[in-house]
């Protein structure tokens, strides 16, 4: 009997797969599909690490609690109350919900956050100038820049057949926790572990020539082609920082990066074995 695409062998001899799940995915109806696909990948022999965010859910809880939501250039300004919300939502509810869904699908997840190990060492980001936010440096508060990834911890879990599930919070040497963008975490983990592929899964089906037309998905992009799209204005808004961070990760050795979303069963494994078949694959 031939194997289904979800169970087809996926080779990661050159490095693990890093899969970043946006909060809209972790908290949405596609979670069961993704959990099943991730479990199938690990059963097929793939080494994988999951990174997740939770910005949309954190925003909703802040609004319910009456905590102001401020963003600068897509970055969440994080005071002490906002950081507590991120801990509750991202390292708490969403990490547990994702791990529970993976257990139900047959995987062996281990939920982690930056202070676990610490898996993600960080320092406070100094004030800096952000595009569109005026000429003066802006202090984002308790937002961190990654200074280290505990590669040994993540590889130890993977070698034991476990699936690390990492929430996007970092920890400083002084015990201070920091909010970190999930795309940034995923890119850095992929770089540090020499990932065979990085998958950025959200509700966007890939890089589109026309944001209003899902059929305009671009299967494959080089860095030069991606920069030309940005310069032409075809790529806008949140896709620009996603592409810019991806370009930097490719320059530092990540072999390929996949941008995809709205997945059906088996799509994740298919994209891993047939790059560009489901989303957009970025290559150097």
Swiss-Prot record:
Mind listing the UniProt keywords for this protein, alphabetically? Answer: Amino-acid biosynthesis, Arginine biosynthesis, ATP-binding, Cytoplasm, Kinase, Nucleotide-binding, Transferase
Which Pfam families does the protein's record reference?
AA_kinase (PF00696)
Compartments, record wording: Cytoplasm
Do you know which Gene3D superfamilies this protein is assigned to? Acetylglutamate kinase-like (3.40.1160.10)
**Principal location class:** cytoplasm
Provide the Gene Ontology terms for cellular component: cytoplasm
Which pathway does this polypeptide act in?
A: Amino-acid biosynthesis; L-arginine biosynthesis; N(2)-acetyl-L-ornithine from L-glutamate: step 2/4
Q: Which PANTHER family match?
A: N-ACETYLGLUTAMATE SYNTHASE (PTHR23342), N-ACETYLGLUTAMATE SYNTHASE, MITOCHONDRIAL (PTHR23342:SF0)
Name of this protein: Acetylglutamate kinase
The organism named in the record is Sorangium cellulosum (strain So ce56) (Polyangium cellulosum (strain So ce56))
Gene designation per UniProt: argB
